[in-house]
């Protein structure tokens, strides 16, 4: 053995070729943490010092190669002063460069996935051979940063600027055949042949059949582009990528700038350029928010995994109520491999549900994401019915009938009589109390909420709601089923609106206040979209449905009269009374026309302003900053209350719920991280400036205490 550590070993194979093997003890995957980096330093030094070594193959002892840097460790480094962070980055890069500069040929054998630092390790090798099932990529831009272990330097010199920009700026994972096509790898082989193929490549290089020094040379030099070619390549790329990423996500454009700036330098100077840009991005609030999101998501997955021990296996599911929502739930279940009964009392409802599922599956086939055979398999997994005949075999039932407590209670009691005693029943209600609905059931311990968001196939969040009498098996099974459907479940406790709608309606409350002061809803939408929301509150109201918003507002006002009840009529009341229900009937705040693709397109409608005139109580001058504060303060404070009331267990879950459920701007990290970014004391002071607007703007006593003590929600 040439070197043995806890993450890396180097052992002789044959003919002077050694295997540098990554196999991090106690972990299911390999990652670059401090231990792995320090051992790589030692392993490279050991290889360099051993005159008998004639070649190196780099392998993994796990099912994947290396998933990248351990962000939980490296995020602490981002708090260091710029000079220290840059020095640390360059020190790590020296390890990869020293590996690249070994006198002997090096071959990386890529299995599973090689992402971020994992791919950068492979780029430092002379040759790369890849398993046909493996994927490679540089996903750092998704964390608000860019590759920091030489990725922006080596990749463009290997596969050309255009390809490298696409890989780095998109952050996507690339299949083996695509990597081979652009020249990122030298060979693709069947998984079982990977080790032998890597060894063969190394032998050929040792024998002089392959010139490893010639392969290495382009990575050490400047880019092979003249000044005009550089200008055309980089300026076009920056314009296109900036348009795609938008102004709130600087990392993709910064990556291109770094590649451009380093284009005329050799490797070592180019790595300094990369490090300087990396440090600049690491210090941005966007990077802190997106890394925070990543860590929150990891926490969510860990929590959801804990329920697996108690969860029952769901072999057959059912949905009550077809239509668009029921069809969406059936589609998602069948697509992910759980067959589902879809029951409705009307033939038209069943047809609508089947049409919805077929349409969604058809779109996947069109995009090449599903084979026609798999589409047929998924469609066969949806079994329409108008009776409870087969419900005796069902493991979980999702009730998705009309949002009316009496109707839901009647349907739930009916289905309870048709299923086996240990079947789980879940209601897809968005606002009705789970404990109230449970009163109609004989086995309330088997009942919980399972709130999907519309459209089901696009929205990742599922709220799993625990009622007063809900048992752990019901929660665990519902969480496991949601995960199996490809969703991100969050367990919340019962209250009006649960987590997401409880937080959303105060946001709409802020919108109502602005409208009552005569502020143009088109302006409000523009300001909030600029803030980072996918759509402004007027457009969102139209998409959700004014009638849905009207009903939800009444439920929330009843549940929280101290701050959500309103005096007199608001915008949603007059819109509802004028039968302007939003997209569903072609007129709401906006009017809707059908575009060439048959999709609704919003246009301003003077009639909407006439409808709103009676609710304007005064004309008030407000700045764009005021608009943001009117909207965001109530949303943030209600999120704080949900955490304090135990509706949601952790700050991470609260923030992820808003990002996955209502499209809270990811680069701002969630409502609680947004408060942290302003500063808790500063946020409390800001809210106090708007105190005259009512209780929605009044911080809680506990938040004031946090402000006084200098506390934060994260870190």
UniProtKB/Swiss-Prot annotation:
HAMAP family in the record: FadB (MF_01621)
Which positions are annotated as binding NAD(+)?
325, 344, 401-403, 408, 430, 454
Record-linked PROSITE patterns: 3HCDH, ENOYL_COA_HYDRATASE
Which PANTHER family does the annotation name? TRIFUNCTIONAL ENZYME SUBUNIT ALPHA, TRIFUNCTIONAL ENZYME SUBUNIT ALPHA, MITOCHONDRIAL
Where does the record locate the signal sequence feature? none
* Subunit structure comment from the entry: Heterotetramer of two alpha chains (FadB) and two beta chains (FadA).
Residue ranges of the region described as 3-hydroxyacyl-CoA dehydrogenase: 312-715
Instruction: Name the pathway.
Output: Lipid metabolism; fatty acid beta-oxidation
Does the keyword Zinc-finger belong to this entry? no
What organism does the UniProt record list as the source?
Pseudomonas aeruginosa (strain ATCC 15692 / DSM 22644 / CIP 104116 / JCM 14847 / LMG 12228 / 1C / PRS 101 / PAO1)
Name the catalytic site residues: 451
* Disulfide bond residue pairs: none
| InterPro entries per record | 3-OHacyl-CoA_DH_CS (IPR006180), 3-OHacyl-CoA_DH_NAD-bd (IPR006176), 3HC_DH_C (IPR006108), 6-PGluconate_DH-like_C_sf (IPR008927), ClpP/crotonase-like_dom_sf (IPR029045), Enoyl-CoA_hyd/isom_CS (IPR018376), Enoyl-CoA_hydra/iso (IPR001753), FA_oxidation_alpha_subunit (IPR050136)
Q: What does this protein do?
A: Involved in the aerobic and anaerobic degradation of long-chain fatty acids via beta-oxidation cycle. Catalyzes the formation of 3-oxoacyl-CoA from enoyl-CoA via L-3-hydroxyacyl-CoA. It can also use D-3-hydroxyacyl-CoA and cis-3-enoyl-CoA as substrate.
Which keywords describe this protein according to UniProt? Fatty acid metabolism, Isomerase, Lipid degradation, Lipid metabolism, Lyase, Multifunctional enzyme, NAD, Oxidoreductase
**Biological-process GO terms, alphabetical:** fatty acid beta-oxidation
Catalytic activity, reaction form: a (3S)-3-hydroxyacyl-CoA + NAD(+) = a 3-oxoacyl-CoA + NADH + H(+); a (3S)-3-hydroxyacyl-CoA = a (2E)-enoyl-CoA + H2O; a 4-saturated-(3S)-3-hydroxyacyl-CoA = a (3E)-enoyl-CoA + H2O; (3S)-3-hydroxybutanoyl-CoA = (3R)-3-hydroxybutanoyl-CoA
| Gene Ontology terms, MF aspect | 3-hydroxybutyryl-CoA epimerase activity; delta(3)-delta(2)-enoyl-CoA isomerase activity; enoyl-CoA hydratase activity; long-chain-3-hydroxyacyl-CoA dehydrogenase activity; NAD+ binding
- Region (Enoyl-CoA hydratase/isomerase) residue ranges read 1-190
Descriptive protein name? Fatty acid oxidation complex subunit alpha
Q: Which GO terms describe its cellular component?
A: fatty acid beta-oxidation multienzyme complex
Q: Which family does it belong to?
A: In the N-terminal section; belongs to the enoyl-CoA hydratase/isomerase family.
Q: What SUPFAM superfamilies does the entry give?
A: 6-phosphogluconate dehydrogenase C-terminal domain-like, ClpP/crotonase, NAD(P)-binding Rossmann-fold domains
Site feature location: Important for catalytic activity: 120, 140
Which residues are substrate-binding?
A: 297, 501, 660
């Amino acid at each position: 053995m040439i070197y043995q550590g806890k993450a890396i070993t180097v052992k002789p194979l044959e003919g002077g070729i050694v295997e540098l093997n990554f196999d991090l003890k106690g972990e299911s995957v390999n990652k670059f943490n401090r231990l792995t980096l320090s051992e790589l330093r030692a392993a490279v030094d050991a290889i360099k010092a051993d005159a008998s070594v004639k070649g190196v193959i780099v392998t993994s002892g796990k099912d994947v190669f290396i998933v990248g840097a351990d962000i939980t460790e490296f995020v602490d480094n981002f708090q260091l002063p710029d000079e220290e962070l840059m020095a640390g980055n360059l020190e790590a890069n020296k390890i990869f460069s020293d590996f690249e500069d070994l006198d002997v040929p090096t071959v990386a054998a890529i299995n599973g996935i090689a992402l971020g630092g994992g791919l950068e390790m492979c780029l430092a090798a002379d040759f790369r051979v890849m398993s046909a099932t493996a994927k490679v990529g540089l996903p750092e831009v998704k964390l608000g940063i860019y590759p920091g272990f030489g990725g922006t330097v080596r990749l463009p010199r290997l596969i050309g600027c255009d390809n490298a920009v696409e890989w780095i700026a998109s952050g996507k994972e690339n299949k083996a055949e695509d990597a081979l096509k652009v020249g990122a790898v030298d060979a693709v082989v069947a998984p079982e042949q990977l080790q032998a193929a890597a060894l063969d490549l190394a032998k050929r290089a040792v024998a002089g059949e392959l010139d490893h020094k010639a392969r290495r040379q382009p990575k050490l030099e400047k880019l092979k582009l003249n000044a005009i070619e550089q200008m055309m390549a980089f300026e076009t790329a920056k314009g296109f990528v900036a348009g795609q990423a938008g102004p709130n996500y600087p990392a993709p454009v910064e990556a291109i700038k770094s590649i451009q700036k380093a284009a005329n330098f050799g490797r070592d100077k180019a790595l300094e350029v990369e490090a300087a840009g990396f440090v600049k991005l690491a210090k941005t609030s966007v990077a802190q928010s997106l890394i925070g999101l990543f860590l929150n998501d990891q926490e969510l997955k860990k929590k959801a995994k804990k329920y697996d021990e108690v969860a029952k296996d769901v072999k057959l599911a059912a949905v009550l109520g077809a239509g668009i929502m029921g069809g969406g739930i059936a589609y998602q279940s069948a697509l992910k491999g759980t067959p589902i009964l879809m029951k409705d009392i009307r033939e038209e409802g069943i047809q609508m549900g089947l049409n919805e599922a077929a349409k969604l599956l058809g779109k996947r086939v069109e995009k090449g994401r599903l084979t026609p055979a798999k589409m047929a398999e998924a469609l066969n997994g949806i079994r329409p019915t108008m009776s409870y005949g087969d419900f005796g075999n069902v493991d979980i039932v999702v009730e998705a009938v009309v949002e009316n407590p009496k109707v839901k209670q009647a349907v739930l009691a009916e289905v309870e009589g048709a299923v086996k005693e240990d079947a789980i029943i879940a209601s897809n209600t968005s606002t009705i109390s789970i404990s109230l609905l449970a009163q109609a059931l004989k086995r309330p311990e088997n009942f919980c909420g399972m709130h999907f968001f519309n459209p089901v196939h696009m929205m990742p969040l599922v709220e799993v709601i625990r009622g007063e009498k809900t048992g752990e098996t019901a929660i665990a099974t519902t969480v496991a089923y949601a995960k199996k459907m490809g969703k991100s479940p969050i367990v919340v406790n019962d209250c009006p609106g649960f987590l997401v709608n409880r937080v959303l309606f105060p946001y709409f409350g802020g919108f109502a206040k602005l409208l009552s002061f005569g502020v143009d809803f088109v302006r409000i939408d523009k300001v909030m979209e600029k803030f980072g929301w996918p759509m402004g509150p007027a457009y969102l109201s139209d998409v959700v449905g004014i009638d849905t918003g009207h009903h939800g507002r009444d439920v929330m006002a009843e549940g929280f009269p101290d701050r959500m009840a309103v005096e007199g009529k608001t915008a949603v009341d007059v819109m509802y009374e004028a039968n302007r229900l939003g997209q569903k009937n072609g007129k709401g705040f906006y009017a809707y026309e059908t575009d060439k693709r048959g999709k609704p397109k919003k246009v301003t409608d003077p009639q909407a302003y006439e409808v709103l005139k009676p609710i304007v109580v005064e004309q008030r001058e407000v700045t764009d900053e005021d608009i943001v504060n009117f909207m965001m303060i109530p949303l943030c404070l209600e999120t704080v209350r949900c955490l304090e009331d135990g509706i949601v267990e952790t700050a991470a879950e609260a923030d992820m719920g808003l990002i996955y459920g209502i499209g809270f701007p990811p680069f701002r990290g969630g409502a609680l991280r947004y408060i942290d970014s302003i500063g808790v004391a500063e946020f409390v002071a800001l809210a106090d400036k708007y105190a005259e607007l009512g209780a929605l703007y009044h911080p809680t006593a506990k938040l004031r205490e946090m402000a006084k003590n200098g506390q934060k929600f994260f870190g």
